[in-house]
Amino acid sequence: MPQTVSFTRMKDGTKEDYALIYAAERRHAEGLVDRVLDALRALRPKEGEGMPLQVDRMEHCLQCATRAYRDGAGEEMVVAALLHDIGDELAPYNHCELGAAVLRPYVSERTYWIVKYHGIFQAHYYAKHVGLDPDARERYRSSPHYADCVEFCEKWDQESFDPGYQSLPLEFFEPMVRRIFAREPFMSDRAVAESAADA
């Protein structure tokens, strides 16, 4: 049986308890890339399921990443393009935020922002057909990342629903994903700053 902590309330935990927890968290984090790639694979629909698109959502992500790669985007952005929709299965109404949250500790503020807001920017292409505002992205025009998000959607995201496009396989991108997620997570300073701002 695995070793467990002594407490039933966190405030009663000891230094040894928290050392045990942190060691387990480090071991768990080692499998993160495999879980992220599994989440991407889960975008392949089961028989009789899926969206009525000409490609499934995993293929859409592969096309988006392939286009970014072939356009000479940096590795971080290629990985973001690959993973931008991984939240679709668990968070269909806020998938952008979930995907961005997964990437956030490992990517720049720019990349995080693009993934977080790409859904609003992507709506520019279809909103008028479903009774939404196609210019909703304009509320973010003052962001230093606005033009980059427009470009992400225009060149890669909205283009990537083509059954005739020759995308690269997931195996091509896996080493890139592993390198990005091997970075030292730099969320702590950002999290502290945001907690202070929210207080």
Where are these regions (language model features)?
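Metal-dependent phosphohydrolase cores
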Residues: 1-82, 86-199
